[in-house]
Amino acid sequence: MARPLILVSNDDGFRAQGLRALADAIRRFADVVVCAPETEQSTTSHSLTLTRPLRLREVAPAVFAVDGTPADCVYVALNGGTRVLPRMPDLVVSGMNHGLNLGTDVFYSGTVAAAREAALRGIPAMAASADVGAERDAAAAACAKLAESLVSLAPISPEPAASVPPPFRRKVPAPLVNVNVPPGSAWPVASTRLGLRLYEDIVEFRQDPRGREYLWIGGGGVRHEELAGSDTSAYDRGAISVTALLLDLTSAGDSVLTQRMVTAVPSS
């Protein structure tokens, strides 16, 4: 039986130790191609670079760098013919991120966005993140085992009929999983939902030596709301969280609100 082909990306850049550890662990059961950002792209979310040209370079055999965002990297790999991949991958894994992507972090995370870009294009995908206090090789091995499980349980969506033009093939969303590893070197594993990860949001105004104002934004302290079965609760009790993410963001529970809004607007 042929070995699976797995595309590995991240948002920390192709030199990141977490990516290298995870790619090495995945090579135990699959062939790996890496396509990752040239530089760190944390918190770039799902942005694509459309206002300037991108550059792609092969920095080592089957290791590619793109001077763009994580989503750019996966987009280029999946749509660039055989420049990066010899064929469509069986799975895309993004990570292993240096730091967590719990709860609402998924909306900002470049790590999660790289995986989401693949899922939008019909390729099963997994985002993997580890606490800075996690033992790297052990965390990578745990994430690789979950990736191996996913690639066997969620095979790629069937190829559409030959009559479908190639640019529009494999557009059916595929499974998307978010994995977070807490501190330590051995962990239980839990199937979870997204939790609530709340930051002390800060805007800090400063002045440069010439008296011109500049500012920094970002979260300060962080706390987790207690929510049974959540990824944040799993983290707090020392368990690896495995969370399935939806690509359909429709809030069915708010349909009454939107219907009332529509009713309140006179027809033109």
Summary of predicted features, one role per range:
Residues 2, 6, 16-87:
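A cross-family phosphate/adenosyl-ligand binding-site feature
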Residues 8-15, 105-106:
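Short, glycine-rich nucleotide/cofactor-binding loops
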Residues 9, 35-37, 67, 94-97, ...:
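Short beta-strand segments
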Residues 114-118:
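Hydrophobic/aromatic ligand-binding patch that stacks against planar heteroaromatic rings
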